Regions:
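C-terminal (or distal) subdomains of carbohydrate-active enzymes
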Residues: 10-12, 17, 107, 114, ...
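Metal- or metallocofactor-binding catalytic centers and their adjacent structured scaffolds
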Residues: 7-123, 128-129
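Hydrophobic, mid-to-C-terminal alpha-helical segments
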Residues: 1-7
Length: 464
């Protein structure tokens, strides 16, 4: 304090530096992706645990807050944010220990969250027919989104029916049904509507003799997914997106083939965990052929599966569209075996002189579309110069991006060789999504869409 007071008295006209500092070590945005994924997952999970633990404590149903579990989990997350761990520049054995520590943090965080959700669910009036299912919203605005829930029954079931609080039947998609040790479990998918801010909505689950027949605006074929908002068309030979059409505005959002996975030579001059050496695109996955299969069509979700090969690696994408949701989801599984290559998903956007915006901690920033590898959090956005429309790219676990003119790309995986020669070799899962919107990113609420993609609605089967 004394130092600051003395400086203030000097009244020197200090120079002001406005804007970001130079980007350093862009390879760190994508190296060791499983560590980065665990970091994102734990950050989201702990925020949910804190919110619902506080609500459970304030409800008066208990005088206990799981501070030890939450504190110890945060300590692990923060320790792993040390610059040689989270940035991906440690040696291989470090990440074996880090994986174990994240598992411990997740166990503690989930224990705190689940205990709090059960406490709150048991306070809710749930008398009535069937089994109560409570859907919780961890974000501070009302949401209508898909929910996946695991339901347990003590008697045999052949199908499931879900009713809302008014008794109206809600379209439900049965994903899996199995019997084990005298209990029957059903994995279901349904659209929860108007779940209140930091609140809940109650549904009732009943066994059914057969799967329900519901009206749905969701249609699908071997190359087209369509709902009331979006029509997505794929090339059945390559798996590339040929059209992303906004039905509400009549706008085509792709200027050329989209969701093209580009394998790029990545040959930095040393320090490959830290640095990139991006050169030419050596292959566009799918240009040598791809498998495109129509694997799922229900009243809630339809899915096309795209399988593509690159050298010794395999990429499997489930491209999903939900009834009532203006967003296309991509769930990606990959077996990565390459070195000195980076793979990005590219989206050329049909917008006039677009402005590139990137989410940063506690805000968003505009950057020039020069093609440099830059960091961002849960979303980036391209909106046209007039602010009439835009396209947001959401993600659940990636931090490296680039925008060149009207093409935005997300960095999915790379093959660094130093200090860990086996960095990122093996199996990975991730998710990203495209969200077309009217207006710019603020008017389109892209910041909310990024949070929703990372913190889906939570379902808890309550005690009767």
């Amino acid at each position: 304090q004394a130092y600051l007071e003395k400086i203030e008295k000097l009244r020197i006209n200090y120079p002001v530096v406005s804007g970001e500092l130079n980007f350093v070590f862009p390879g760190c945005y994508t190296t060791q992706v499983e560590t980065k994924k665990a970091n994102r997952r734990l950050e989201n999970l702990l925020l949910e645990a804190e919110k619902f633990s506080s609500l459970a404590r304030l409800s008066g149903a208990r005088d206990y807050y799981p501070d030890r579990d939450i504190d110890e989990s945060w300590k692990i997350v923060l320790r792993n944010q040390f610059h040689d761990i989270l940035d991906g520049s440690a040696i291989g054995p470090v990440y074996e220990e880090v994986t174990e520590s994240y598992q411990e943090a997740e166990k503690r965080a989930r224990r705190a969250l689940n205990f709090s959700l059960k406490t709150l669910a048991n306070l809710i009036e749930t008398r009535g027919e069937g089994s109560p299912l409570i859907v919780f919203n961890s974000l501070p605005w009302e949401r209508t989104e898909p929910v996946e829930a695991r339901l347990v029954f003590n008697t045999p079931v052949e199908a499931v029916k879900i009713l809302d609080a008014s008794g109206a039947e809600t379209p439900v998609q049965l994903l899996e049904l199995k019997e084990e040790s005298g209990q029957w479990t059903a994995e279901v998918l349904f659209m929860a509507k108007n779940v209140p801010s930091l609140g809940y909505k109650t549904y009732r689950v009943l066994p059914a003799k057969s799967r329900g027949k519901y009206k749905s605006q969701l249609t699908a074929s071997s190359r087209i997914l369509e709902n009331e908002f979006i029509r997505l068309t794929l090339d059945p030979e390559t798996g590339w997106w040929k059209s992303l059409f906004d039905k509400k505005t009549g706008r085509e959002f792709l200027a050329a083939s989209g969701n093209v996975l580009e394998a790029i030579a990545d040959e930095p001059e040393g320090m490959s965990a830290w640095e990139t050496g991006l050169k030419e695109v050596v292959e566009k996955l799918g240009e040598k052929g791809a498998s495109v299969k129509f694997i799922e069509k229900g009243p809630v979700r339809a899915t096309l599966r795209v399988e593509q090969l690159f050298r010794s690696s395999k990429f499997v994408q489930d491209i999903q569209l939900y009834a009532g949701l203006p967003r296309v989801d991509i769930r990606l599984w990959l077996n990565w075996q390459e070195r000195n290559v980076m793979v990005k998903a590219a989206f050329p956007v049909a917008l006039n002189r677009p402005l590139a915006t990137f989410e940063i901690p506690f805000g968003a920033i505009n950057r020039p579309a020069t093609g440099n590898e830059v960091p961002a959090l849960k979303w980036i956005d391209l909106s046209d110069e007039a602010g009439q429309a835009g396209l947001s790219l959401l993600n659940d676990s990636r931090y490296g991006f680039d925008v060149k003119d009207n093409t935005m790309r997300i960095s999915l995986v790379r093959g660094a060789t130093y200090p860990d020669p086996e960095a990122d070799r093996g199996q990975h899962q991730l998710a990203y999504a495209l969200y077309p919107h009217q207006g710019n990113w603020k008017q389109g609420l892209s910041f909310r869409r990024g949070l929703e993609f990372n913190q889906p609605l939570l379902a808890e089967q309550a005690l009767i």
